Amino acid sequence: MSDRVRVRYAPSPTGYLHIGNARTALFNYLFAKHYDGDFVIRIEDTDSKRNLVDGESSQFDNLKWLGIEWDESVDKDKGYGPYRQSERAEIYNPLIQQLLDEDKAYKCYMTEDELEEERQQQIERGEMPRYGGKHAHLTEEERQQFEAEGRKPSIRFRVPKDTTYSFDDMVKGEISFDSNNMGDWVIVKKDGIPTYNFAVAIDDHYMEISDVIRGDDHISNTPKQLMIYETFGWEAPRFAHMSLIVNEERKKLSKRDGQILQFIEQYRDLGYLPEALFNFITLLGWSPEGENEIYSKEDFIKIFDEKRLSKSPAFFDKQKLAWVNNQYMKQKDTETVFELALPHLIKAELLPENPSEADLDWGRKLVSLYQKEMSYAGEIVPLSELFFRDEQTLGDDEQEVIAGEQVPELMNHLYSKLEALEPFEAAEIKKTIKEVQKETGIKGKQLFMPIRVAVTGQMHGPELPNTIEVLGKDKVLSRLKKYV
């Protein structure tokens, strides 16, 4: 293993980029960049039946969108390739044969039914289910008999007895496993494909991976990988097992959990900002010193410290994500936010599919009204609902405001002035409201609240003159007329 920091993110193309996997990639990326090391992406694609056609490309595309840049992968071979497990058979096969020749592994011909029967018997006896070693010492005659029956063997690693496998985890501390609690495990499946724990240890060694940073659901895999390192006389990498991400019920974040969007692509489609997701995800199970919660990618690289990875589960707080994204939305120029919001306005049929320049200008004004409130670009649709409804239904508080004794006089003055107003723009509208104030003597909440309720149906909202401009003269006069 080299002295240089080399870490890897090893996704399977059986699915799209999940929040949990994105966090694994992020922490590996930040760790590598903090130590001026290499961030490697390796594709674990041996489960060909479950691989998605666009699974691999989607992973790369969404990582790039998040701002995660890799130093090595299928598109950047730095001499450690191939970077797809399916293309590394020439590396695995001699090592498999070596283990067979040294009697450190053996062929097992047991069927799935036989293995399940053994497992059930162990459970009935109150034992921990594990392979009992029935085919660990077959004679040549027995092997030939199984072959003649058409049985295809798997290959099992012969687990050493009375051995303790320990490692000092960067997050969890010292962790140990007793080999006597483990059965001989499969390193090559019946179809000839190496299993995860065998292949990953081989790959990490030959790619000179110095540190393995992953979720703590992989802790139980570690002793098997340590066995492979030990049996070949290789130095094991350092390990860091991150705490799991949990939902509001403090249950492990599951892809079947309908309460939380699970995939980066979903947030991307809604109009979340990549730098906001980068920021939010980095704070899932890791915390910087101090109270600040908004950092740039460059800041995170500078301050990232693996010692601050949390042992406790990371809570996925949807409200916190909305807040973080809103902080970034407020900093963006309106044109950027408008470009993100435009597809949502068109999809909701609030703008035509082929908008004119006038439509686009109106859309920009609409977005500028709500930019400081927006948690994500797609939120422009529910936020701006008041601009598009034909009928307004007032709540009790709104009805109380509009029933004020000063309202008829106020509405008469405002209606006549707005009807004659040209150009119908926010600055002129603001002047008009001030003129109404002077002429009627109505001021403060008595002035502004009835106007807002009359034109928007709401007690609160964006700047009133700007709102009136974006609503447009016809719609505003139509709504005011009810109270004249």
Curated annotation (Swiss-Prot):
Q: Quote the subcellular location field of this record.
A: Cytoplasm
Catalysed reactions listed for this entry: tRNA(Glu) + L-glutamate + ATP = L-glutamyl-tRNA(Glu) + AMP + diphosphate
Q: What is any one GO biological process for this UniProt entry?
A: glutamyl-tRNA aminoacylation
Q: Where's the motif 'HIGH' region?
A: 11-21
Q: Which CDD domains match?
A: GluRS_core
Which UniProt keyword terms apply here? Aminoacyl-tRNA synthetase, ATP-binding, Cytoplasm, Ligase, Nucleotide-binding, Protein biosynthesis
EC no. given is: 6.1.1.17
- Residues annotated as binding ATP: K255
The listed location of motif 'KMSKS' region is 252-256
GO CC term (a single one): cytosol
Looking up InterPro entries in the UniProt record yields:
aa-tRNA-synth_I_cd-bd, aa-tRNA-synth_I_codon-bd_sub2, aa-tRNA-synth_I_CS, aa_tRNA-synth_I_cd-bd_sf, Glu-tRNA-ligase_bac/mito, Glu/Gln-tRNA-synth, Glu/Gln-tRNA-synth_Ib_cat-dom, GluQ/Sye
Disulphide connectivity of cysteines: none
Q: Which Pfam families match?
A: Anticodon_2 (PF19269), tRNA-synt_1c (PF00749)
Kindly report the protein's main subcellular placement as a broad class: cytoplasm
Q: What is the annotated quaternary arrangement, including any partners?
A: Monomer.
Family indicated by similarity = Belongs to the class-I aminoacyl-tRNA synthetase family. Glutamate--tRNA ligase type 1 subfamily.
- NCBIfam families in the record: gltX_bact (TIGR00464)
Main role? Catalyzes the attachment of glutamate to tRNA(Glu) in a two-step reaction: glutamate is first activated by ATP to form Glu-AMP and then transferred to the acceptor end of tRNA(Glu).
Q: What is this protein called?
A: Glutamate--tRNA ligase
**Organism for this UniProt entry:** Staphylococcus saprophyticus subsp. saprophyticus (strain ATCC 15305 / DSM 20229 / NCIMB 8711 / NCTC 7292 / S-41)
Q: Taxonomically, what lineage is the organism? A: Bacteria, Bacillati, Bacillota, Bacilli, Bacillales
Encoding gene per record: gltX
